[in-house]
A protein has these predicted regions:
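Terminal domain-start segments
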Residues: 1-78
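Short, surface-exposed coil-to-beta transition loops
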Residues: 65, 108-109, 115-119, 156-159, ...
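Short aromatic loop motif centered on NTY/YTY
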Residues: 130-246
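Short, solvent-exposed mixed-charge patches
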Residues: 254-256
Length: 256
């Protein structure tokens, strides 16, 4: 997500919704590398959070606490609420960075001094213990042919999973970001910002799935100033053939 100041438009500031706070406190210490006592103190402090229309009886929520953010996804059964957590899960000691890894963050407490921020998916069991269901619930990144991967590298493209629209709806987006240049990107280019589409990741009420296209309701534009062109701000300006105006979407994933 964007830096904290830009994280959530129209967000509230206060203590996190109880189920988000309970999840963050209950995460196994061996997962998150931050002592439970530290987390118990932190969730009592002011944080930014926002309700998002979802598919359950209660709204989804997104909240941020320092370098940690969490997004809940509701379904028909509140007992199966799913949480996407972005946190310092991989301690630098023993974790190998890759070409798309951001710099590690320094931890405020615990025995791990620095860790890489990753995303994991959790559900809370009947015993109150969060279970890591990432491998089951989150589809792998879309496959990229070796020729396309070589083309990305030649143009200094970076594969990114965009979480920024989770403050509005149920979708994330895989794309390739190229440096600012007049050079045209590949056949799946979109927007005015040197980007190439790979796939969306969409919550469907029970899990996440890859989709080639979504509706505008699933991928809303950021608000713009009064009088400005709708969908005219960063990062929404420019053509985007993968966001449809209608209500029907194609679940097939394109091959970049």
């Amino acid at each position: 997500l964007a830096p904290q100041g830009d994280l959530m438009i129209g967000a509230c500031q206060g203590t996190l919704p109880p189920h988000l706070a309970a999840l963050l406190v209950a995460l196994p210490e061996q997962d998150i590398h931050l002592p439970r006592g530290w987390r118990e103190r932190e969730v009592r402090q002011k944080a930014w959070f926002k309700a998002v229309a979802g598919m359950g009886q209660r709204p989804d929520f997104i909240g941020r606490l320092g370098d940690i953010w969490v997004r809940s996804f509701e379904g028909a059964d509140a007992s199966t609420t799913t949480y996407l957590v972005s946190a310092p899960f991989d301690c630098v000691d023993g974790a190998l960075p890759n070409e798309n890894t951001a710099e590690p963050v320094r931890l405020a407490a615990g025995s791990c001094e620095q860790a890489y921020v990753r995303q994991r998916v959790y559900q809370v069991g009947s015993d109150g213990v969060p279970q890591d269901i990432t491998a089951m619930a989150m589809p792998a990144a879309p496959s990229i042919a070796e020729a396309d991967r070589a083309r990305h590298r030649a143009r200094e493209g970076k594969v990114i999973l965009d979480h920024s629209k989770l403050q509005y709806g149920p979708a994330m987006r895989w794309f390739v970001q190229y440096p600012e240049s007049p050079q045209k990107t590949g056949p799946h280019s979109f927007s005015d910002w040197n980007r190439e589409h790979l796939s969306f990741v969409v919550w469907n009420g029970t899990g996440f799935e890859l989709r080639d296209t979504v509706t505008r309701a699933q991928w809303p534009c950021d608000p713009v100033a009064p009088g400005d062109k709708p969908c005219g701000g960063f990062p929404d300006s420019g053509p985007d053939a993968y966001v449809l105006a209608g209500s029907t979407v194609n679940s097939a994933v394109s091959s970049p």
